[in-house]
């Protein structure tokens, strides 16, 4: 069995690493990404920063990914929640919940570099980047994906992780919000 993941942003790259880790490389994963690893113009791994909740960091640690991200992460020790113009607020601290941090802030470009470094050595993962899906066909048993490079990939599962305007989901008439 094999899985073809189209889109190597945060969701696709993390899924590929999770499958590799949880199956110890026994399930073949093909990751197709339009941008070269470390590309400055990667839309999913740009200069934006995101906050990862403590539970997310724990899940990433469980699949062996957090260890690669921790050194570029800034811990969140306090969160202040208020609504301007309205009375009341709440302040949450990691200390009161007996946590090292409520979460961490990471820059997506750093995350992308580190995820792709891990992907290059992940058992069972084959990277196809930069490359794009030209077309695909489905049968009851499998999906065949033809890449713009001419390579053909066959798998039992096709994952559309190619962004909020997924061309793969669109071609399959998958509705989403």
Provide a role label for each language-model segment.
Residues 1-3:
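Extreme N-terminal starter segment of soluble prokaryotic enzymes
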């Amino acid at each position: 069995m094999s899985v073809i993941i189209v889109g190597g942003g945060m969701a696709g790259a993390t899924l590929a690493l999770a499958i590799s880790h949880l199956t110890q490389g026994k399930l073949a994963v093909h990751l197709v990404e339009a941008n070269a690893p470390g590309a400055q113009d990667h839309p999913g791994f740009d200069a934006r920063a995101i906050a990862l909740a403590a539970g997310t960091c724990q899940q990433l640690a469980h699949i062996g990914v957090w260890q690669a991200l921790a050194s570029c992460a800034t811990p969140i020790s306090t969160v202040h929640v208020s609504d301007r113009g309205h009375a009341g607020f709440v302040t949450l601290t990691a200390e009161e919940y007996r946590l090292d941090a409520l979460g961490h802030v990471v820059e997506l470009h750093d995350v992308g570099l580190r995820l792709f470094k891990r992907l290059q050595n992940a058992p069972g993962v084959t990277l196809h980047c930069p490359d794009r899906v030209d077309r695909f066909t489905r049968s009851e048993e499998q999906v065949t994906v033809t890449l713009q490079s001419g390579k053909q990939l066959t798998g039992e599962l096709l994952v559309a992780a190619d962004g909020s305007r997924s061309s793969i989901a669109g071609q399959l008439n998958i509705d989403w919000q």
